[in-house]
Curated annotation (Swiss-Prot):
Signal sequence region: none
NCBIfam families found in the cross-reference section: KDO8P_synth (TIGR01362), PRK05198.1 (NF003543), PRK12457.1 (NF009109)
Assigned protein family: Belongs to the KdsA family.
Reactions performed catalytically: D-arabinose 5-phosphate + phosphoenolpyruvate + H2O = 3-deoxy-alpha-D-manno-2-octulosonate-8-phosphate + phosphate
Entry GO terms, CC: cytoplasm
EC number: 2.5.1.55
Protein encoded by which gene: kdsA
Class of this enzyme: transferase
Protein name: 2-dehydro-3-deoxyphosphooctonate aldolase
GO MF, one example: 3-deoxy-8-phosphooctulonate synthase activity
Biochemical pathway: Carbohydrate biosynthesis; 3-deoxy-D-manno-octulosonate biosynthesis; 3-deoxy-D-manno-octulosonate from D-ribulose 5-phosphate: step 2/3; Bacterial outer membrane biogenesis; lipopolysaccharide biosynthesis
Covalent S-S links between cysteines: none
Organism from which the protein derives: Enterobacter sp. (strain 638)
Broad class of the protein's primary localization: cytoplasm
Length: 284
C-alpha cells in the first residue's frame, strides 16, 4: 500500500521510510541549554545516520499550575530557534497555542505542531493550515484514532495536506495513559496513509491526582519505544534532558541525555528490521 511522503526540506517522512527522530527538550529553559542539547542530538543522529528534527516549546501554555514555568515566550523563543538552525543546520518543530502565533512561528521553524488539547479548535487549525507549513497533529488523549480523520479533513479544507499524525497515548481512567498501538494503523487509514509518529515521552506521563505537575515513568521509555517502532511507523518523538530531576517541565518522563545514543541504536535496529519485511496483508 502506497504511503504518503511529507517532506521537511530534504527530510522525507513516511511510514515505509527509515524513521525520523523528532527530539529535543520539552521547553526552552535557556539559550545555552538548548544549544547543548541540540548539539548532542545532532552529534548522535549524524553518527547513527538518523534524519533529525529538533523539538522544543517556546511557551507551555497548558501547564497544570499557574506557578509552573512556561518558557521564554514567542519573541525570545524564535531567536533561539534561529540560532540553532544557523549553528547546527537543523530543522525545528515547535507548537503553537493561538491562531495569531501560527504565521510568525511558521516563518522561523520548519514544522508547526497542533497541541493535543487544542486539536479540535477549528480557528487554530485554519490559521495553521494557511501557513502552508508541515503540520504535526498531536492526537488528543480523549479522541479515538478513527476520529483523527476529521482533524485531517479540516486541514485539507484549509488548503494544507502536509500532515503528520502523532500518538501520545489515551486516557485510562483518571490520571493515567495507555498506548493502543492498534490505533497507529487506524490513523494511517483515515488520513490517506499520512506519516504517523509516536510521542513516547508524553505517553509515559501519569500524575498525582492532587499534584501541581505531571509525574512519569521514564524507566519504561525503552520498552515502550521499541514496541511502538515495531509496528512500522514514520518516526519517534522524544524529549531528553541532561538532568531530568531538575528539568523545568516533564522531567520524570524525559530520557537522560547521556542515554540517547544507546537508546537510538536499539530503536534504529528495530526500525531497520521491521522495514526490511515485505508488507503482509492478513485482512483477507
Amino acid at each position: 500500500m502506497k504511503q504518503k511522503v511529507v517532506s521537511i526540506g530534504d527530510i522525507n517522512v513516511a511510514n515505509d521510510l527509515p524513521f525520523v527522530l523528532f527530539g529535543g527538550m520539552n521547553v526552552l529553559e535557556s539559550r545555552d541549554l538548548a544549544m547543548r542539547i541540540c548539539e548532542h542530538y545532532v552529534t548522535v543522529t549524524q553518527k547513527l545516520g538518523i534524519p533529525y528534527v529538533f523539538k522544543a516549546s517556546f511557551d507551555k501554555a497548558n501547564r497544570s499550575s499557574i506557578n509552573s514555568y512556561r518558557g521564554p515566550g514567542l519573541e525570545e523563543g524564535m531567536k533561539i530557534f534561529q540560532e540553532l538552525k544557523q549553528t547546527f543546520g537543523v530543522k525545528v518543530i515547535t507548537d503553537v497555542h493561538e491562531a495569531s502565533q501560527a504565521q510568525p512561528v511558521a516563518e522561523v521553524v520548519d514544522v508547526i505542531q497542533l497541541p493535543a488539547f487544542l486539536a479540535r479548535q477549528t480557528d487554530l487549525v485554519e490559521a495553521m493550515a494557511k501557513t502552508g507549513a508541515v503540520i504535526n497533529v498531536k492526537k488528543p488523549q480523549f479522541v479515538s484514532p478513527g476520529q483523527m480523520g476529521n482533524i485531517v479533513d479540516k486541514f485539507i479544507e484549509g488548503g494544507n495536506d502536509q500532515i503528520i499524525l502523532c500518538d501520545r497515548g489515551a486516557n485510562f481512567g483518571y490520571d493515567n495513559l495507555v498506548v493502543d498501538m492498534l490505533g497507529f494503523s487506524v490513523m494511517k487509514k483515515v488520513s490517506n496513509n499520512s506519516p504517523v509518529i509516536f510521542d513516547v515521552t508524553h505517553a509515559l506521563q501519569c500524575r498525582d491526582p492532587f499534584g501541581a505537575a505531571s509525574s512519569g515513568r521514564r524507566g519504561q521509555v525503552t520498552e515502550l519505544a521499541r514496541a511502538g517502532m515495531a509496528t512500522g511507523i514514520a518516526g519517534l518523538f522524544i524529549e531528553a534532558h541532561p538532568d531530568p530531576a531538575n528539568a523545568k517541565c516533564d522531567g520524570p518522563s524525559a530520557l537522560p541525555l547521556d542515554k540517547l545514543e544507546p537508546f537510538l541504536k536499539q530503536i534504529k535496529a528495530i526500525d531497520d528490521l521491521v522495514k526490511s519485511f515485505d508488507e503482509l496483508d492478513t485482512s483477507n
